[in-house]
């Protein structure tokens, strides 16, 4: 791997980017791409010792990289608050990429009484983003990019508010799909609210298509069959290719709020603007999701 700037990534000289889950998987590739573009990158992680190796690898590939680690567990609202308190009064944040994701094989409840997949993949990023708004809005060109998934349109295709936390029936795949749909809905709604308030914030989303990452193996809590692994080898993108949609959403100077990037051919391909799933276009559902999210996290929209 070289230290060149990828063609989908504009120069980020002088800009500060926060990447959640930047110590592994697509989060790591996102952090690497932004470091190559000369951004100052803040990588968040739940475990500092394990993440140091990942950051050292970025520095070895990009010797001039400005990258540092910060502790953050998105499944814990207390951890989110502590991180926000450390960051919000510091340097302006130009870019927040909510890339961290988890699939929990069996239903777990966090210390806050929340289902863990929903907390990690959506409610934590919701609270984090609203908490960091003051730092983002000190940037002349602030941007938030939510990493969604093709799974957002699978299953029910809309948020099941009657069983949002899987109390009646828990499926790891459905929980993940619902959280990723919520991420996309949040990206659209945040952009609309920022625009209505006269704020310069761009809020968009991206999906990586089908990527060969650890997350793909974790959906059912077991190693996939030989047949599934063979199909993945045929149709899944390498992570360094899958990340291109995320990097384009995060850096494209022509991006607008509500835009959604993904591979040209769905599973793989060059990053292009994708069609937003119908479930995410329901204004009433987005408004209700926002209200529920504020209630569950205790974090309010205060532009």
Give residue spans per PLM region.
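Alpha-helical packing segments of well-folded alpha/beta enzyme cores
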Residues: 54, 186, 242-245, 289, ...
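C-terminal helical subdomain
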Residues: 179, 229-273, 283-287
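A short C-terminal helix-loop "cap" of Rossmann-like NAD(P)-dependent dehydrogenase/epimerase domains
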Residues: 166-167, 222-231
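Pocket-edge positions in alpha/beta enzyme catalytic cores
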Residues: 43, 72, 234, 278-281
């Amino acid at each position: 791997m070289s230290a060149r700037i990828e063609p989908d990534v504009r120069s980020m000289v002088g800009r500060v980017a926060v990447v959640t889950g930047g110590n592994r998987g697509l989060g790591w590739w996102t952090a690497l791409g932004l470091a190559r573009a000369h951004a100052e990158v803040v990588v968040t992680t739940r475990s500092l010792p394990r993440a140091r190796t990942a950051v050292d690898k970025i520095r070895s590939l990009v010797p001039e990289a400005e990258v540092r680690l910060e502790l953050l567990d998105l499944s814990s609202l207390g951890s989110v608050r502590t991180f926000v308190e450390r960051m919000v009064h510091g340097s302006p944040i130009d870019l927040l990429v909510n890339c961290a994701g988890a699939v929990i094989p069996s239903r777990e409840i966090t210390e806050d009484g929340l289902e863990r997949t929903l907390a990690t993949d959506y409610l934590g990023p919701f609270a984090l983003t609203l908490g960091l708004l003051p730092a983002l809005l000190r940037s002349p060109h602030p941007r938030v990019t939510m990493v969604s998934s093709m799974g957002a349109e699978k299953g029910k295709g809309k948020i099941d508010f009657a069983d949002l936390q899987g109390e009646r029936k828990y499926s790891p795949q459905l929980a993940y799909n619902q959280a990723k749909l919520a991420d996309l809905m949040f990206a659209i709604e945040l952009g609309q609210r920022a625009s209505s308030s006269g704020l310069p914030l761009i809020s968009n989303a991206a999906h990586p298509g089908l990527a060969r990452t650890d997350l793909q193996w974790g959906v059912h809590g077991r190693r996939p069959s030989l047949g599934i692994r063979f199909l993945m080898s045929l149709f899944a993108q390498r992570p360094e290719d899958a990340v291109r949609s995320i990097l384009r959403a995060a850096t494209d100077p022509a991006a607008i709020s509500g835009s959604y990037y993904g591979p040209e051919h769905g599973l793989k391909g060059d990053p292009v603007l994708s069609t937003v799933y119908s479930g995410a276009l329901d204004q009433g559902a987005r408004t209700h999701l926002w209200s529920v999210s504020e209630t569950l996290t205790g974090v309010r929209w205060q532009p």
